[in-house]
């Protein structure tokens, strides 16, 4: 038998949509756009780390992090 708590009563509306699927594609295109932007961000970080994207006056060595 489940015990009713105040926290459970507060969280119940968040679970009311369980099992329901929005018709069509929903927010999939928006998610795809953010995934592409995140991928581009990761590529830029990787290129900076590998020094294949050169930025003037920015040192990416570990020694530059020391005080």
Curated annotation (Swiss-Prot):
Regions annotated as coiled coil: none
GO MF annotation list: phosphate ion binding
Chain segments annotated as transmembrane: 29-49
InterPro entries listed in its UniProt record: PSII_PsbH, PSII_PsbH_sf
Any one GO cellular component localisation term in the record: plasma membrane-derived thylakoid membrane
Topology within the bilayer: Single-pass membrane protein
Role noted for this protein: One of the components of the core complex of photosystem II (PSII), required for its stability and/or assembly. PSII is a light-driven water:plastoquinone oxidoreductase that uses light energy to abstract electrons from H(2)O, generating O(2) and a proton gradient subsequently used for ATP formation. It consists of a core antenna complex that captures photons, and an electron transfer chain that converts photonic excitation into a charge separation.
Family of the protein in this entry: Belongs to the PsbH family.
Name of the protein: Photosystem II reaction center protein H
Source species: Synechococcus sp. (strain JA-3-3Ab) (Cyanobacteria bacterium Yellowstone A-Prime)
């Amino acid at each position: 038998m489940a015990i009713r708590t105040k926290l459970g009563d507060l969280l119940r509306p968040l679970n009311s949509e369980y099992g329901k699927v929005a018709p069509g594609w929903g927010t999939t295109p928006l998610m795809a756009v953010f995934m592409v932007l995140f991928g581009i961000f990761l590529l830029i970080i990787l290129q900076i780390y590998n020094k294949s994207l050169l930025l003037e006056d920015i040192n990416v060595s570990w020694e530059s992090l020391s005080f």
